[in-house]
């Protein structure tokens, strides 16, 4: 099992934290364990409440069913069903940017 550094950033929410996240742990779960309060609703990858935007690194969000190919190509990620596959940086609180 690998552990990656995941940096979560939201200027509006005053968040700029780097957390450790195992490659078999969802990023949202790791953030909560680290004491961060990120938005979520379904926790199943079927809505956009937890949406973020990846700015560096890579993730696996193959469990998600909400984002379309264009949104994924643009870097959007559902943190509730995303595993890190490298060190990465994600802008949180990006739901409004999807629409």
Curated annotation (Swiss-Prot):
CDD domains listed in its UniProt record: fer2
SUPFAM superfamilies, per database record: 2Fe-2S ferredoxin-like
Source species: Limnospira maxima (Arthrospira maxima)
Cofactor requirements of the protein: [2Fe-2S] cluster
Name by which UniProt lists this protein: Ferredoxin
GO molecular function terms noted in the UniProt entry: 2 iron, 2 sulfur cluster binding; electron transfer activity; metal ion binding
Keywords: 2Fe-2S, Electron transport, Iron, Iron-sulfur, Metal-binding, Transport
UniProt-annotated binding residues for [2Fe-2S] cluster: 42, 47, 50, 80
Role summary: Ferredoxins are iron-sulfur proteins that transfer electrons in a wide variety of metabolic reactions.
Listed GO biological process terms: electron transport chain
Family annotation (InterPro entries): 2Fe-2S_ferredoxin-like_sf (IPR036010), 2Fe-2S_ferredoxin-type (IPR001041), 2Fe2S_fd_BS (IPR006058), Beta-grasp_dom_sf (IPR012675), Fd_pln (IPR010241)
Record-stated family: Belongs to the 2Fe2S plant-type ferredoxin family.
Coiled coil: none
2Fe-2S ferredoxin-type domain sequence ranges: 4-96
PROSITE patterns tied to this protein: 2FE2S_FER_1 (PS00197), 2FE2S_FER_2 (PS51085)
Domain of life where this protein originates: Bacteria
Cofactor note: Binds 1 [2Fe-2S] cluster.
């Amino acid at each position: 099992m690998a552990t990656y550094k995941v940096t979560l950033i939201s200027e509006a929410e005053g968040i700029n934290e780097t957390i450790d996240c195992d490659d078999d742990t969802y990023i949202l779960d790791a953030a909560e364990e680290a004491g961060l309060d990120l938005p979520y609703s379904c926790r199943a990858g079927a809505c956009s409440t937890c949406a973020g935007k990846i700015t560096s690194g890579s993730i696996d969000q193959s469990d998600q069913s909400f984002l379309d190919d264009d949104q994924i190509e643009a870097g959007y990620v559902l943190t509730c069903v995303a595993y890190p596959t490298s060190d990465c940086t994600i802008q949180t609180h990006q739901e409004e940017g999807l629409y």
